[in-house]
Amino acid sequence: FTGIGKVAGDSPVILLNGFSKVHLMTGWRIGYIAFNNSPKLGPIRENLPKLARVRISTNLPVQHAALESLRGPQGYVSEFVSELKKRRDFVVNRLNSISGLSCSVPKGAFYAFPKIENNPYKTDQEFVMELLRKTGVLTVHGSGFGAKYGSGHFRIVFLPDIKTLDFALNEIEKFCQ
C-alpha cells in the first residue's frame, strides 16, 4: 500500500478522517484534517484554524481520548476488522438466504444495505416501520440516504455480536415470509 501523499508530489492532498469506526468512538463527533506540503494549500492551511475557532469544537476530554487512541497500541484494529468481516459475511449470507431480499457485500462500512424485492408495502420506509412494529428490529429505510439509490432498500448495522445478529435476522426472515 502506498498512500496518496507519497505519490502526489506538489499536488494538493487533503485528508479528512474520523475516530468513529477504527477507534470505536462512534457518536463522539471527533475527526481530523491533514494536508500535504503543496504550496497551493497555503491559504487553506492558514485560514482553516480561524474557521475551527468559530465553530463549536469537540470537548477537551474527547480530544485527549482521541489523542490517546492514536498513541496507544494498535493491535486491536486488525482484530476488530477481522471480527467485523465475520459479522458482515454472516449478515450478508443470511440476508441473501431470505426470500425477497438481496444484499451485496459492503466493503467499507459496518452496515449492510439489502434490497427489498417485491416489497409488499408501498415504500421502504413503510417496510422498516412495520418491521419495527411487528418484530422490534430497528433498521433504517434506504430512501433516507437518497431516493435515487436508496429507495427499495434498508440499512442494518452488523456491529452487534453474532448471537444478537442471528436473533434479528431470524425476526427479519419471519417478517418477510
Q: What is the meaning of each model-derived region?
A:
Residues 1-4:
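Conserved PLP phosphate-binding loop immediately N-terminal to the Schiff-base lysine helix
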Residues 6-85, 94, 176:
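Conserved core segment of the aminotransferase class I/II
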Residues 13, 101, 137:
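Short, conserved active-site loop motifs that form the nucleotide-linked donor/cofactor pocket
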Residues 17, 32, 105, 113-115, ...:
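Short beta-strand segments
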Residues 63, 67, 82-92, 103-116:
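Conserved glycine-rich beta-strand-loop-beta hairpin in the small C-terminal domain of fold type I
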Residues 118-121, 161-163:
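Helix N-cap motif at beta-to-alpha junctions
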Residues 130-139, 145-177:
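PLP-dependent enzyme catalytic core of the Aspartate aminotransferase-like
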